[in-house]
Structure formats: structure tokens, C-alpha cells
Amino acid sequence: MGTSCNKINSNSNKGKENMHFVLDDNGDSKGNASNQQVERDDKLDMETTRWNGKEFEEPLSTNKKLIIQSNNTSSQHSTPPLSISDTSTHTGSSTDNVEANPNTGFSSARKRSLRSSNLKKKFVPLSSPEESNESEFIDDDESDEVASIIDIKEDETFDSKVEIPEAAPSSSTESDEESIPLSYQSKRRRVSARASSSASSSSRTQAKSIPSHERTHYRLIRQHPELEHVWEKLEEEAPREVKQIEQPKELVLNLLPFQREGVYWLKRQEDSSFGGGILADEMGMGKTIQTIALLLSEPRGKPTLVVAPVVAIMQWKEEIDTHTNKALSTYLYYGQARDISGEELSSYDVVLTSYNVIESVYRKERSGFRRKNGVVKEKSLLHQMEFYRIILDEAHGIKSRTCNTARAVCGLRTTRKICLSGTPLQNRIGELFSLLRFLRADPFAYYYCLQCECKSLHWRFSDRSNCDECGHKPMSHTCYFNAEMLKPIQKFGYEGPGKLAFKKVHSLLKHIMLRRTKLERADDLGLPPRVVEVRKDLFNEEEEDVYQSLYMDSKRKFNTYLAEGVVLNNYANIFQLITRMRQMADHPDLVLASKRKTVDIENQENIVCKICDEVAQDAIESRCHHTFCRLCVTEYINAAGDGENVNCPSCFIPLSIDLSAPALEDFSEEKFKNASILNRIDMNSWRSSTKIEALVEELYLLRKKDRTLKSIVFSQFTSMLDLIHWRLRKAGFNCVKLDGGMTPKARAATIEAFSNDINITIFLVSLKAGGVALNLTEASQVFMMDPWWNGAVQWQAMDRIHRIGQKRPIKVITLCIENSIESKIIELQEKKAQMIHATIDQDEKALNQLSVEDMQFLFSN
């Protein structure tokens, strides 16, 4: 079968010649003169070639009716005839027949100069004429992608191969074929091969529709066959049975039933293929004591390394000494105590250090530090030693896979790894990856090459161009966690492939994580009830005038940005406007006093956060040399969404800052005192605010009810705490304060004084310094002075007192000024909390992300 081949003749006259032919479905041709144009029923593109300066149009498939008109400009020779053979009705293919035109006097063996410089797309039919009238064009750059799609389809079926058939032998003479340049022969073979694959075109159309994450999956399996049945094997392996371990003899404190189960699970998990796991009990359920019991339940040889936030280091040491009767020897590897030999350090049972120290010694070992003689590198003792076990407290601190702290922690050497976190997934599914990488969970935390057998736990591209292991490009590598879980969830949410990815996440977590909540274990815990209230007050007349002036000015600026469509471009300005309004709701002096410079200007510029205008707590510095509170700049970046294209709120250039960098070391307590707001205002004529007086009223009522009740007052602004401290002392309350300018020993002494001194009834705590890793069960009342749209920070603060050991009913009061931005912030906080609870770890929007719509809501009347 096949259509007849018709010759296309042209006159040999000089000058301009018009040639027109019509090739119908039966292969019949007709001639007619016309101007240059190309018409086709379905607008099929034609391949334009040039023969000795003459242009002609050659269809790659003739199953459609083609009308081709050409207006050729004559040169020395006329256009030779072209014979076209229809191949669309065959499963095979034949090359184009080119014969000599007797009218021209040229033989078919003549050397022909063919070019295809005008060819912009190659037509590749991906479906047969009988199945579809649709066709697809594939660029030159996509030709390799077509082959890869076919290979992927081959992997998908696993029972048959999709082959590209070879072109059928040409019906022309051998001399005719040889007369065509090799470059054109090669191109025609490729085009012919694709056109001849119409028998399998339906399969290729389906292959093209395979989502990118599935194509990555098939390519992974092709290069790494061991990954084919990972999830089946994981499902077959039942989660470890949880039993109760016997009470360790050296442990003074009696473990609760669920805590004994936790210790048993930790022991079994260390013996599993994962070599550890994540203990994710809700905050306040005794993760620390369960870990101490684990240390006592095994013979001790090499030391165990405990990495915790600075504020929690002394608490760990105190609990180990108290609950084990000093059966475990501990060493605090921090500050000046880092000058110790490896042999001496190995003699201790437990080594305690902070994330900041781990990052600092790792950076000095890898990158070095500048001295007069150049860059000096210093070996890290912690990274040279091999520990028996490594425990990460508040492990969500390494949730960012790209931060240097995460790299530093993953560089430690051990075979047993435990993560402790009440919130392992705070905002995004992607936060789980850093914990998996620390656990060295195989294959979930590894990077794989799609072109060879290369496999690595870390992203190793020293020159940012080629893999250090195999030499292939970054685009040829993928993370198994991303390919199997993160990408499908990001793209599809909780539907289709996204739902399957969620099931994979849950299946994995069942094998590496143990989580119990207070509600589930209420009978074991016996915790008292907790009541959460919001107290709403109104500005007085003077405060409202000042606030409205600031609010209207801020709203005018925001509306200008909104009208011009540059809200996100001015995000730093808007964030500062919101911060100023929050401060104004606390006390007008927080905003007005920020403009008064009564201390050394240069000194203050170095220690004041550029976001909140407070003394920077847990201070870190950006690449543009501006100082921020770690919490302030973290919230600032998180509120922007993905953290990309965020500008510095001070100089407005792109912000570059390491959120995990160690705190600046030159922030002494004396500097904090000198920069206090009390040194910038006249306290003799100072007047309190509505919110501070509301707090004083609540504390008076508590003291009248029971003088032994203790309270904690949380605020994000240290200047607000300074004003509260001054006012409460005037009112006769004995209180202490914890902020970011205190050393670990000073913090520990302050906490001990509050816990043991019955005369100290109020603890003023900065959210930036004491929101996590504190055990303050001596208090039963909590006052939140300034609400924030991300309620997670406040929830963690509440759990500082609602935990094991609490005997009194808990009451949490959030103070809110009704006619201010705070009322809308609370509404926004509730809306976001409902969104998180209504979805399963939604990945597209973080809990603390502040969208344009949220900003509009905050600035609405």
C-alpha cells in the first residue's frame, strides 16, 4: 500500500519562476502559479530546505491534504524535481525519492548543496492519523527529551519496550542517496524514524503526559534498582512494638508508664536500621527525663553528646545531677571550657554543648577565620571525636537544610542519633528533611544521580557545576525525599499524587517517630486544666490620638504601595510599620523614645535591632553589617513567605544573613543596661500606659486571692519589659527579668531565684530569650503582653508552665488593646490556627507567612 509518487517539474527558463503543486490524500499532484504562501488544512509546518539557492517546501507526512506554493527566484540552474513517497500509512518508513528532471539536464548523481538554516522546528507525529488529528512540534533542543520520554514509558510498562523503528530502505538509487550531504541524510533519518513510529504513537502520547515527578521516579529506579520496592518493604516491616522498660535503678524520679514506653522505643530504635529516631512528645511531657533514663539503662563507654539551645544547657546539667544522684559525669563544653583535650573529654559520660558552639567550631575548621597573617583554620575537637550517641534537644532548630548549623550537626560522628522536639514539623513538610539527614535515613535523606550509580548524603558540588563524585551536572541529581514526598505535595496538595505522598510521609514517620500528646495521656500525666483568655481594653484619649496619627500615616503609605502594585517590593517598610503599631499599643514611649539618643550613638547603633529598635537579643549580623535580634529577623523573613528576594529593613539591599550563626560575642550586660529605654526617657515625669495598668490590675487581684501564686509575663520587646519592671517595683511587686543579654550562668541563677525564693512572685521573660527550653512549673499564671499572628511562639511559651510537675490550675491571659491593630492580629492568629488544624501539614503556606491579603486585613478599618 502507499500513495503514488508524482514528479514535480519546473521550467528551466531564467528569471522568476512560479511553481505550485497540490498533493492530495491519494498522492495526485496538480500545478498552478501563485505568490509565495503555505496553506494547510490543519496548519502543518513544512520543512524548508535550499537546493542550489532554490527553496522548496517538503512535507514530512502526507496523510493530510497539502497545498504548497513557491515563488522561486531563478539562479544559474532550475529546481530539480522532487519525488515524495507517503509513509504515513505504513509502520515503516521510506526516504524521499529524488530523481533527475530531464528538462534540466542535471543527473541525480550531481552534488547538491542542501541547507536547513530556516528550519526552526521538526515535525514529529505522536499519534497516528486514525487515532487523532492532533500533532505536536518538538524543538531541536527537545529531541533528547523525546527519547527520554520513550525510555520512561518503557520503565513504566516493565513488560514491553517502545522502540524507534529504523527508516525503511530508500526506493531511490544508491547514487541518489550518496549525492545528499551527510548532515542532511542524518537529519532526514531522524525525522523519518520519528515519523515512522506511528504504530506506537499512542504510547508516546501517554508518556508525554507523565508528570515530572513520576519521570524522575522511573529514572531513579533505572539507575538505582534497589529503590524500586522501598515503600513496599517499609510497609511490610511493622512499626516496632512499644513496651514498658524497667525503672533504671540509678534514676531517682519514678517514670510514668508512657515514659517507660518511650525509653523502650528509644532503645529499640537505636538498634534498627535507622540507628535512632525522633521523640516528638508534646512539650512538657518529660522528653528530657526519658533521655536521661536511656543513658542510665546501658553500660557507659564513649561519651554521649547533648546539643541544646544555650538557655537549656544548664537545665540539662541540673536535671542530670538531680535525678541521677550524679551517677553520670557531665562536662559543659561552652565558652572558656572548650580548652580541653580529646582524651580528657572522653572520660565524661555526657558532654553538653550548644548549637552555636557546634556551628562555630565547624565553620572555623572548614572556612577558617581571618587573622593578620591570613586565614587560619582550626580543627574541631567535637568533629574529630566519635561519640557513642548524639542527642539533639529542640531538634527543629536545624529544620533549614541549608543553614550552617544543620551542616555542622550532620558532620558529627556517631552511630546512634536521637532527636527531641515537641514540634518537629512547625510549618512545612520540608522541615523534616534535616532531621532525616541527621539520622542518615537511607534512602530517604540521600541524593541520587539520574545518570549513574552516584549516591551521597550531602550535596557535593564544590565548583557548583559538576558533582564531586561522578562529575555529572546538578540537574542530573535529585534528593529522594524531594522526589518521592515533597514535590508531589507541593504540586498536588492532598489530591492524587499528593495524597499518595502524604501516605508515604506517614508511613515513614511511623517507623522513625514516636509522638504522644497531653490529651492522649491525660490519665498518666494528671495535669491540671488550662484556661486561655483574652482581656480587651481601650486606649485612653491621649493614647488613641497618638496611635491614630501613626495608624493613618501607616495606612496611607500602605495604600500607596497597594495602588502602585509594589507591596512586596516594600515589604521591609510595611513590616516596620506593623511593628511600630504593635509597640504603640504597648506604650507610646516604645516608638517615641526610639528617636531619642541619650547614650553613645555609635555604641547604640551596634547593639540595637534594626527591626524592633530594641537592644538586640541573641544578636546576629547580616552581610551588610546590620544587627538584628535572631527572632525578629527570623519572623521578618518567614513572614515574607519563601524567604527569597527579601531586602534588608535598614539599607534595603538583598538581605543575606545566617540565622543559625552564633550570637555576637561583644554584647555585654553593661551594654544592655546602658541602652535600656530607661536611659532614654525622663522617668520622673513618665506616665504608664493602658496595657501596663491592666497588667498591674490583674496582678493585684492575684495577690489578693493568693500571695503564693507566681506569674510569668512574656513580651517580645525588652523595652516593654524594662518599663513593666520599673512600674511593678513601684507597685510593691518583687520580680526578676530574663533577657538575651545574660550569660548561661546568669540565666540559671535567675531561674533558680524565681523557683526557690517565695518572695519573688513575677518573672519577666523575653520571648526571644526564654520562649523555649525552660521549666517554670513554679508559676501558674501567664500574661502575654503583645500578640503575634504566628501563635506557635506563644503556645511554646504557655507550655513552659503547663507540663509535668505542675500542680495548680493554669490561666493564660493575653492583653489586647481593642481599638488597635492587636485585635486584628488576634483574629488573624485564630484564622491561621484554624487553617493549620484543618489541613494536614499544609506545605504551600507556612503558619507564620504574612500574605498581601493578610496585610490588607491588618490595615482595614
From Swiss-Prot:
Transmembrane segments: none annotated. Residues 1-13, 60-82, 96-106 have a biased composition (Polar residues). The keyword 4Fe-4S does not apply. It comes from the Eukaryota. Residues 695-848 form the Helicase C-terminal domain. Its main location: nucleus. InterPro entries: Helicase_ATP-bd (IPR014001), Helicase_C-like (IPR001650), P-loop_NTPase (IPR027417), SNF2-like_sf (IPR038718), SNF2/RAD54-like_C (IPR049730), SNF2_N (IPR000330), SNF2_RAD54_helicase_TF (IPR050628), Znf_C3HC4_RING-type (IPR018957). Its EC number is 3.6.4.-. A zinc finger (RING-type) spans 609-652. Residues 1-217 are annotated as: Disordered. Residues 131-145 have a biased composition (Acidic residues). Residues 109-123 have a biased composition (Basic residues). It is found in: Nucleus. ATP binds at D281, E282, M283, G284, M285, G286, K287, T288. One of its GO terms (cellular component) is nucleotide-excision repair complex. Belongs to the SNF2/RAD54 helicase family. This is ATP-dependent helicase rhp16. It comes from Schizosaccharomyces pombe (strain 972 / ATCC 24843). The gene is rhp16.
